Every structure is written in structure tokens, then in C-alpha cells.
UniProtKB/Swiss-Prot annotation:
This is NADH-quinone oxidoreductase subunit B 2. It comes from the Bacteria. InterPro entries: NADH_UbQ_OxRdtase-like_20kDa, NADH_UQ_OxRdtase_20Kd_su. Its cofactor is [4Fe-4S] cluster. Belongs to the complex I 20 kDa subunit family. Binds 1 [4Fe-4S] cluster. NDH-1 is composed of 14 different subunits. Subunits NuoB, C, D, E, F, and G constitute the peripheral sector of the complex. [4Fe-4S] cluster binds at residues 44-45, 110, 139. Its main location: membrane. Its EC number is 7.1.1.-. One of its GO terms (cellular component) is respiratory chain complex I. The lineage of its organism: Bacteria, Pseudomonadati, Bacteroidota, Cytophagia, Cytophagales. It comes from Cytophaga hutchinsonii (strain ATCC 33406 / DSM 1761 / CIP 103989 / NBRC 15051 / NCIMB 9469 / D465). It catalyses: a quinone + NADH + 5 H(+)(in) = a quinol + NAD(+) + 4 H(+)(out).
Length: 181
């Protein structure tokens, strides 16, 4: 048949009011429902983000009730709009100030690929200077799309191992962007 072995639950952790789980699962659940976004908005997508934060869409339902305007307190960097090459070092500095774990969302066509601005002065995607976890398409994306992007970050936050940030793969990713810990 199959040589797959199903892990048995540990003894002594059953009964009313008890459950058996891993520390990764508990911390993932807490991270998933307590994301603090840092908006880095420069263009039209920033307007759509303001609509997303309004009462019509109620982003608080998704655990992102409190936007942070300090990188040291933020979990999710939402980059929205056109990023000029002169702004690149500022964006990277903001990213480096964020504490681990951190996630980056490129909201809209301009942040993802430069959008319609294919010029020498516009960064053709923020993934050239910082690692991006989620891309939200659109010009500008609708609030529903931004919420869907945040829900994707929630999925990443809930399933990410506590040890992933210490893995050789993650360190290689940071080295690719020349980011020191």
C-alpha cells in the first residue's frame, strides 16, 4: 500500500478545553490576525488604499485594523504607486528598519513593474531593490484586490515557520538584495 505514516497525537493532551498543536501554528494564528500595515503611497493606488481603510470595506475584519506609520512597528510594507529611482534608497531604508517577520506587498502596476512609466527615472518594479512577497495587479487596483493581497499575506503569515527566517534560502535571498541583518 503506502508507506505514509500519520503522526499520532501526543498522550496526555486530550480532554475538554485542551488541544494539541505546534508553536508554529499558534504564533501563525496570532500573526495572521494582527497585521500592522505600513502604507508607502505615492500615486493613485494610495487613494484606493484610503478607500480600503474606510468603513465600506472594513479592513479591520482581516486583522489590519491599525495602520502603522513607523517602520519599526509594522509587519507589512504596502508599496503603492510610482517609485522614482531617487526614492529607491528611501524605500529600501524603510524596509531595513522593519523588524522581522516582515512582508512586502507591491500594490498596482507601477509598484510591480513601473506601470506606464517606462522612463529612465522610474524604478521598473520594487523587486529590484527589496524582496516582494505579494503582487496586487491593477491600475489602480480595486479595494477588493488590495484586501485579497492582504489575505494572501495572512496565508503566508499563518503558515510560515518560525525558523524560515534563519534558513539558508532566506539568507541567500537577503544576500541577493545586498541586505545585511
Amino acid at each position: 500500500m503506502s508507506d505514509i505514516k500519520i503522526e499520532e497525537k501526543p498522550d496526555g493532551l486530550e480532554g475538554p478545553g485542551f488541544f494539541a498543536t505546534s508553536l508554529d501554528s499558534v504564533i501563525g494564528l496570532a500573526r495572521k490576525n494582527s497585521l500592522w500595515p505600513l502604507p508607502f503611497a505615492t500615486s493613485c493606488c494610495g487613494i484606493e488604499f484610503m478607500a480600503t481603510m474606510a468603513s465600506t470595506y472594513d479592513i479591520a475584519r482581516f486583522g489590519a485594523e491599525r495602520p502603522s506609520f513607523s517602520p519599526r512597528q509594522a509587519d507589512v510594507l504596502l508599496v503603492m504607486g510610482t517609485i522614482a529611482k531617487k526614492m529607491g534608497p528611501v524605500l529600501r531604508h524603510v524596509y531595513e528598519q522593519m523588524a522581522e517577520p516582515k512582508w512586502v506587498v507591491a500594490v498596482g502596476a507601477c509598484a510591480s513593474s513601473g506601470g506606464i512609466f517606462d522612463t529612465y527615472s522610474v524604478l521598473q518594479g520594487i523587486d529590484r531593490i527589496i524582496p516582494v512577497d505579494v503582487y496586487v495587479p491593477g491600475c489602480p487596483p480595486r479595494p477588493e484586490q488590495i484586501i485579497q493581497g492582504l489575505m494572501r499575506v495572512q496565508d503566508l503569515a499563518s503558515t510560515e515557520s518560525l525558523r524560515r527566517r534563519e534558513s539558508p534560502e532566506y539568507k541567500a535571498l537577503l544576500a541577493k538584495y545586498e541586505i545585511e541583518e
